């Protein structure tokens, strides 16, 4: 009997453990990301701002892990869930991605994809200690990262 390779299809449920009233999407927001390759669980950041249209950038270095920045975790493009994409150039009045922003409401995520992307040598290349700093910054925003076994 031939062996068939198992393919891991990424799903939003591979990221989100618990969200208060997911049909309403309290913790999700349309955002703009400076165009760059994005994956499920990608952390993006921007300087804290009340301007909801201010663009986020992909986290690329530990130096960006400061409490004067706000963070979000990407879950899809401007249409829907998408595990891997490059955002289109943003235009006035339009957004190019959907992200989990926290909003002070508790949302629980699995750390697996977030940690995998954050510690990738092609990404932010965070150490375990730096990832724990990221975990603390996300938790302050209401995003809890739960250990993945």
What are these regions (language model features)?
Residues 1-149:
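Surface-exposed, low-hydrophobicity beta-strand/loop segments enriched in small/polar/acidic residues
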């Amino acid at each position: 009997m031939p062996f068939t390779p198992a393919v891991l299809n990424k799903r939003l449920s591979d990221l989100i453990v618990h969200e208060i009233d997911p049909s309403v999407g309290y913790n999700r927001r349309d955002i703009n990301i400076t165009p760059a390759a994005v994956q499920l669980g990608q952390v993006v950041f921007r300087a804290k701002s009340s301007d909801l249209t201010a663009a986020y950038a992909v986290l690329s270095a530990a130096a960006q892990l400061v409490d004067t920045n706000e963070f979000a975790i990407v879950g899809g493009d401007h249409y829907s869930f998408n595990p891997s994409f490059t955002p289109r150039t943003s235009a006035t009045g339009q957004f190019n991605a959907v992200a989990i922003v926290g909003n002070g409401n508790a949302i629980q995520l699995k750390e697996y994809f977030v940690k995998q992307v954050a510690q990738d040598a092609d990404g932010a290349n965070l150490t375990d200690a730096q990832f724990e700093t990221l975990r603390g910054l996300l938790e302050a925003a209401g995003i809890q990262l739960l250990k993945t076994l």
